[in-house]
Amino acid sequence: MPKPTSTLPFLSLLLMLSYFNLGGNLKVANGQKTWCVVNPLTRHAELLANLDYACNHVGCSQIQQGGSCFYPNTYIHHASFAMNLYYQYMGRHEVDCNFTNSGLISLSDPSSGSCTYESDGDIEGNGTSENEISETWCVVKPTTEDYMLQENINFSCNHVDCSPIKDGGSCFQPTTLMNHAAFAMNLYYQSTGRGSTSCDFRGTGLIVTRDPGYGNCTF
């Protein structure tokens, strides 16, 4: 007897298309998970402030030594993890991921390896069954290792003009691989039509709903 054809791939495609409307506005259907991550351009002092604030409200044992999310032992990962816990705990309102404009709501799961970023559902409080988002950006996953960041920069800058992240450019500061990779990846994402696959980067890209640009640095 022939085996029945699975409908899972087709259903997965339909779900993906409902989340990512290529060539138009992105629509977030109720039930789609969201996460809060830190803007890659965030300064060290702000990362510490966000980490302290979030961990004063939620348990951050997972990012302490020996915890499942201690590695990579970076402030940007630890701050993102704590900020997301706070965002989920407070009910996933947009304001719960503000953190003095240093938080970004992600439509992509920041989890990596054994470290799971919690998500209980979509953005609350909009009063509609579907939240339409007119613009999206691509940033880098907080757990991405340096060699992958550099590979993402190299790949993107082979396709787009990365002069803003070169010495003297408007996005050179802060001079971190995380910032430079996010800028280059987003430029590639925008130039290729903002398709979900254009922000994959071997699982290291995140699609976010707020402009990561800061000061004179425009994403």
Stretches with model-predicted labels:
Residues 1-10:
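Bacterial N-terminal signal peptides that target proteins for export
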